[in-house]
Regions:
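Hydrophobic, aromatic-enriched alpha-helical segments typical of multi-pass transmembrane helices
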Residues: 1-264
């Protein structure tokens, strides 16, 4: 092996298990955050009920936000690992794109913290104000006014604009980074066409169905530790790009094999 190729394979082997563990930990933390949040917030309707529940379970709200922040932030590890592996096998990739791969999860982690603080601040203001105290006595008659007051409390939270900035920037960076890494990993043969295409699709829809991307990350973690049937694609062991044959190339290869068998 060339020194650069040997170094690449050594780095990938050394970090495969730690990155896989970080990936699994990320998924568990995000799921735990969802569970904690669902237990803390009741099934009441409207933003007024939401803020009352949050104020009554402030510790759970803060815990959920921190769990989500750590979980989302850890997704930078598998994305960076995949990006670096593909970059080592392709001269077409732009190294500067690694910034989006790292910034996306980290900005979304900051968003989780800021959103949690924003909601806690709004809940405190809402519950301590005169309007919700009046509407709470006649909730059937004043629920609309209570929800309006709760909406105002959320929109007037001082950290809300900053959270929006990190949210938009993080979602765009995560979307582009996951698409870019999955695309080139598929082109270099590190991911099968199915999982590469799925990574691209889930990356494109991550701002709507973020939780579904966790299924793809679980697969990638299992791939890194070799717990999948068939093992890793050949490109992982060779250190070189081994693109998957197109349907036309595959059909041509099958025809050639058939002709050779007939001649024999």
């Amino acid at each position: 092996l060339r020194p650069d190729k040997a170094a690449t394979l050594a780095w990938e082997e050394r970090w495969a298990r730690p990155v896989a563990l970080a990936t699994f930990a990320s998924v568990l933390l995000i799921v735990a955050a969802i569970v904690v949040a669902s237990q803390a917030v009741g099934g009441g309707n409207g933003e007024s009920e939401l803020l009352r529940d949050v104020d009554a379970h402030r510790g759970a709200q803060l815990t959920s936000s921190l769990l989500q922040a750590f979980g989302v932030g850890l997704l930078a590890a598998p994305l960076y690992y995949l990006f670096r592996a593909a970059k080592a096998r392709s001269e077409r990739m732009r190294g500067a794109m690694v910034g989006l791969v790292l910034v996306g999860p980290l900005f979304l982690a900051v968003l989780a913290v800021l959103s949690g603080i924003t909601t806690l601040h709004a809940a405190s203001d809402f519950v301590s104000s005169e309007m919700p105290r009046l509407t709470a006595k006649g909730i059937a008659l004043g629920s609309d006014r209570a929800d309006e007051a709760a909406s105002d409390a959320l929109s007037e939270s001082p950290l809300r604009p900053l959270a929006a900035i990190f949210g938009i920037a993080g979602q765009i960076a995560f979307l582009v980074g996951m698409i870019y890494a999955s695309l080139h990993a598929m082109r270099t043969g590190l991911l099968t066409r199915f999982w590469g295409s799925l990574g691209i699709a889930l990356g494109a829809l991550s701002f709507i169905f973020f939780q579904f991307t966790l299924l793809w990350f679980i697969y990638f973690g299992l791939l890194l530790v070799g717990w999948l049937p068939g093992g890793k694609p050949p490109a992982w062991a060779s250190g070189e790009a081994e693109p998957w044959p197109t349907p036309g190339e595959k059909a041509a290869g099958e025809l050639e094999s058939g002709d050779s068998a007939d001649q024999d």
